[in-house]
């Protein structure tokens, strides 16, 4: 959550982080203060060569009934927009000035399948696991989705999911996540 600066409805988790303790690439432990933690839409320095082990969040006190009501509203809103099947959430980041889900839907991605993974019928930017999805299936499906959008709209979608290559490095380009040409859809 901290590494990707998760957020919803105009809020991001980095807005409330006071500090985070991380294990760095070399194995050293370091505490980063708020002013050292840069981030933006779906990224933060906490996710670059680091693993977050603990953090302090500065949450605001509010009336418990009001908090419960807001939480319930958010759950209902998400329940209406996101599929009930198991998923990893949004596949792609929104491109500037548009929505990945809109482009994917217009490109005809809903219902696409590969390796047991399937693009949700409810939200085109979500790959669901109806029961037998494989990592390779998710990777190939994401690449196929990105190809469709690029070919139809000239927009290169950027992964929000973290896909690792064989060396454990994050692959940002979904088309490059494939060792071979994407399947024909």
Describe the residue ranges of each PLM region:
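Phosphate/pyrophosphate- and phosphate-bearing ligand-binding catalytic cores of soluble enzymes
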Residues: 23-140, 144-185
